[in-house]
């Protein structure tokens, strides 16, 4: 994979002379892609000498950071949030790139019995029987907790889910809490389950309980390093990187 990235970088350098000089690139990103982007940043930095200021968090956190006018060279966020930013003129026209889509899954501790998650009714019963459920603090406005609460409302079990709640700072933290035995189960984005040691996906949410979220990158109007940001995104979205996205839980946007 590192050889593939090196090959991609050769093309990037040919397309962008600006990428030849070391720079500091500030990236504000959704937690759903944290593990993937962190690994790619590490490889890219070693190859180019560029430094990165990498900040991640749930959707509500990102919305707040951007609303304060904080500088960023690159934003990676869910499609709905990108839509909001486009409407308010905060993004450079034509800079948006859809990176992939990711679904949600049920998290259990590695080695624990795998529960039935094959039908909506099975999900309802699992939520009712679980002793504790980890999820992002609703005040942070994360994608997963908003969907989980919609499902709980649909099943008529909101009070039960809330009482069992173990609050986390994000989907990956919810998966961590399950891995460390602080909660029996969690419902997280698949990309926030795969990289967590000690956590295992019992299965994806079934049928109409599933929520697919597209994540995209874009260059904000406040970017001080737009050329370097474009070069980095060119590397991330190259065909050579497709296996890395797939392994990380993402599917191509159709």
Go through the PLM ranges and name each one.
Residues 73-76:
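Periplasmic-binding protein-like
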Residues 1-4:
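Positively charged n-region of N-terminal signal peptides that target proteins for export
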Residues 16-22:
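Sec/Tat signal peptide C-region and signal peptidase I cleavage site
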Residues 6-16:
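Bacterial N-terminal signal peptides
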Residues 23-68, 79-89, 95-102, 108-254:
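Exported/periplasmic ABC-transporter solute-binding proteins
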């Amino acid at each position: 994979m590192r050889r593939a990235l090196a090959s991609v970088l050769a093309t990037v350098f040919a397309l962008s002379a600006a990428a030849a000089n070391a720079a500091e690139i500030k990236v504000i990103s959704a937690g759903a892609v944290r593990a993937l982007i962190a690994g790619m940043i590490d490889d890219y930095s070693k190859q180019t000498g560029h430094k990165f200021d990498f900040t991640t968090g749930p959707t509500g956190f990102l919305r707040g950071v951007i609303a304060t006018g904080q500088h960023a060279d690159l934003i990676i966020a869910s499609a709905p949030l990108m839509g909001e930013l486009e409407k308010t003129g905060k993004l450079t026209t034509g800079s948006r790139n859809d990176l992939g889509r990711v679904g949600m899954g049920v998290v259990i501790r590695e080695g624990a019995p795998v529960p039935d998650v094959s039908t909506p009714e099975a999900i309802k019963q699992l939520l009712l029987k679980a002793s504790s459920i980890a999820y992002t603090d609703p005040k942070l406005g994360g994608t997963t907790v908003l969907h989980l609460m919609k499902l709980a409302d649909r099943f008529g079990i909101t009070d039960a889910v809330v009482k069992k709640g173990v609050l986390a700072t994000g989907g990956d933290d919810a998966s961590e809490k399950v891995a460390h035995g602080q909660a029996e189960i969690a419902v997280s984005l698949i990309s926030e389950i795969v990289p967590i040691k000690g956590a295992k996906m019992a299965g994806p949410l079934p049928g109409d309980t599933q929520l697919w979220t597209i994540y995209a990158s874009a260059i904000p109007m406040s970017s001080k390093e737009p050329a370097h940001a474009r070069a980095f995104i060119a590397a991330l979205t190259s065909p050579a990187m497709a296996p890395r996205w797939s392994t990380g839980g993402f599917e191509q946007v159709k």
